[in-house]
Amino acid sequence: MDKTAEQIIRRRMHGLYLSRKCEDITRLSRDLMGLHCWFHRNVVFSAHIRGAGLTGWKRALTKTWLYRGTLHGVVYEDLPLLLAPHARDHSWEHLLLREMMSEDRIQEVIDRIVGLMGDGVYSRAEMRKIFADDYEQRVIDYLFSSWGGIFVTLACQGKVAFRDMTSRDFDLIDAPPLPMDDHVLSELLRRFFAAYGPATLADAAWFLGLDKNTLINLPVPEELSRLEYGHGIYYYVDDGADMGDIPALTLLSGFDPLIVSYKERGAVLPEEYKKAVILKSGICLPTVAVNGQVAGIWNLKNGKPTVEFFASQPQRIRKAAAELVDELRWSVAGTI
């Protein structure tokens, strides 16, 4: 790793609270623009690894769909901003429904769902029973799919979210997305580069789920610093803070921001390990980083810690990794 690549990794690990601590899970989620929660325990692992307390975590954040249809735990007050790029997003089930009924009729269904939620019906299972006599099974399956169905559309409109971080049921909310203008986009970019920088515009487009062309003609916020590396320009916020050293050993959660938030991941995730970390299903496993680069995977299986390195590591590294996973196991016991 050359000096510039090392500088990039050092700044990223600082920004993502991997070389310093963030004790407040709400601040952590706000700074990172949400915590990935395909599996809700990812939030617990990610927060603990970064030093955040877990008391009341299930209701401290709001679970909803954001970037590229991924589930995140976010600060409720941030929803209008974070939902702005996705206000018109639909689930694939919604798109399939358009082949079977008009958009006006889909809207009638949506209005009925919102009305039922106002009357206290929150679960997809209950909704299925209520709608069973009015629609064919295929429509019911699309509407109330376990992958989200029509609730993805409602969530992107800021009308519903999960009842808490571990629930499968929904609540009505009132968080209409901000209009997606240049001011909102600039604020999203500023926040992204403050936490995830140094990063490229391609990284920002990937993270936010936008077409890169959307960002090409937008003025880059003036407060951003930049560096050139390889064939790219990397933006970041230089606040004069001590970046600290790259930790010799770091646990990363499943779908950890250090891995999944960037279009180009080679600096952190060596190509030869990619298939072992990111499965064909899209799941990103919990990993162990040695000197800022992924070197193995870890997990809690049946409550027992496991660590598997991809290549030979010194005994002190293997022992330290096992101890970190074991400490995490005891720290989160009863939380997930």
Regions found by a protein language model. Give the residues of each.
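Anionic-ligand-binding alpha/beta catalytic cores of soluble enzymes and soluble regulatory domains
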Residues: 194-243
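Phosphate-backbone binding and catalysis cores of DNA-processing enzymes
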Residues: 1-130, 136-137
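A short acidic, leucine-rich amphipathic alpha-helix
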Residues: 124-132, 201-205, 292
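A short, conserved structural fragment
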Residues: 58-71, 156-165, 223-229, 296-298
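Short, amphipathic alpha-helical interaction segments positioned at domain boundaries
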Residues: 83-97, 175-197, 249-253, 258-260
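Non-catalytic regulatory appendages
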Residues: 223-272
